[in-house]
Amino acid sequence: MRGLIINMGEKYNPYEDMLKSMEEAADLLGLEKDDYEVLKYPERELKVSIPVEMDDGSIRVFEGYRIQHSSSRGPCKGGIRYHEDVDMNEVKALSAWMTFKCAVVNIPYGGAKGGVKVNPRELSHGELKRLTRRYTAMILPLIGPEKDIPAPDINTNPEIMGWIMDTYSMFKGYTVPGVVTGKPVEIGGSLGRKDATGRGVMLMTKEILQRQGIPVSEASIAIQGMGNVGGAAARELYLEGCRIVAVSDVTGGIYQESGLDVEKLSAFLQTGKMIEDYREDGVRHITNREVLISDVDVLIPAAMENQITEEVAGSIKARIIVEAANGPTTSEADKILNSENIIVVPDILANAGGVVVSYFEWVAPRTVVSTCPPRIM
C-alpha cells in the first residue's frame, strides 16, 4: 500500500503476533495453559475461490475467506474486508480479536472475520456487486442471524451489506435482515452504525485525556487513516474542540501546527479525492511515518495492522495511543511503548463502538431497543 508503513524484514504474520500477545496477557493474569488453549485455534476456517464475470466478459477468480474463531459466547460476529493484502493469517487474527473485543464490552457474541483478496477500486460497481453476491453464496453455509453475522470493514459499506442480505434472503426464500449489520437504514440498519466505531474512538480518547488531566480543548491529535473509522473519529474530535494537527491516507499525510480544518478536509475527501491532492495555506505534506511520530498528545492509528513496529515505536512522541485500527501495534513494539510509559488504549476496547451498535441493530427486531443515535451514544 502506498504511504503506509510496511515492515520490509521477515514477513509479518498477524496471527502469530496475536498468539504471542495473548500468551503474554495470560501469563500476566496467572492463567494456566489449559485455561486459554482453545482460544489459540479457530473453530472453523473456510477458504473459497470466487469466479466473477468481468464487464469485458472475461472471468477472474478471487480468493475469499470466512473464519469463525469462537461461538462460546453466542453467534460469531465480525466484518468483511475487501483488500489486496487479505490472507488467511490476517483473517484468523482479526477473528480472534473480535472474540476478545465482544467479551471486553460484554455483548453475547463470539468472534469471526471475512475477507476477499481484491482491490475494489479496480472493479466497476457491477463487478463489485457480482463479486459480493458470489462470495455470499459460497460462505452461505457458515453465516446466519443465529450463527455468524457479518458487518462492514475496510472497503465495504452499507450497500455491500445490503447485497449480502439480499443474496442470503434469496437462498432462504424470505427476508432475513439479521444476517448482517451495518446495512442501509431503509432495510433495517441502525442510524448510528456508520460512524459508531469512530464515535467510540472519540469517547475513549476523551476519557483517557480526562484521566490524564489533559483538557480536551487543548489536546493535539494525529490520525493515521481517514477512512470510515479515522474520518469519523477526526470529525467527532474536531467538534469536541481537539486540535487535529496531522492526518493521512494511503497516499500520504498532511500537517498543520495550528490545527487542520477537518470539516473542509472531510468535504474534500468525500468527493473521492485523496490527501495527496489537498492544498490549503499553512498545510504541508508529510509521510505516514511522520504522522505516526508527530509531536502530539494523542496518536490514533486508524489504518491497517502492523503500522507501529519496533522500528517506529522508539520514535513515537505521543503520550497516548488510541488504537482505532485492529492490531496496529506489534507485540514487540508494544514492549517498547510500555518501557517509554506511553499509554495505549488497546484496539479491543478503543474501536468496540462499531460492534456495540451492531449488536443493537441485530437485537432491535427481537426487542423494543431503540437504535437512534442519542440512545446509542
Residue ranges and their predicted role:
Residues 8-13, 208, 318-377:
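Adenosine-phosphate binding glycine-rich loop
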Residues 9-49:
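Short, Gly/Pro- and small/polar-rich lid/capping loops
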Residues 13, 17-20, 86-89, 123-134, ...:
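Conserved active-site and cofactor/substrate-binding residues in soluble primary-metabolism enzymes
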Residues 48-56, 61-120:
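Glycine-rich, N-terminal phosphate-binding loop and its surrounding beta-alpha-beta segment
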Residues 83, 103-217:
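Glycine/serine-rich phosphate-binding loop and adjoining beta1-alpha1 elements at the start
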Residues 189-293:
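Glycine-rich phosphate/diphosphate-binding loop of Rossmann-like nucleotide-binding domains
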Residues 252-344:
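Rossmann-like adenosine-cofactor binding region
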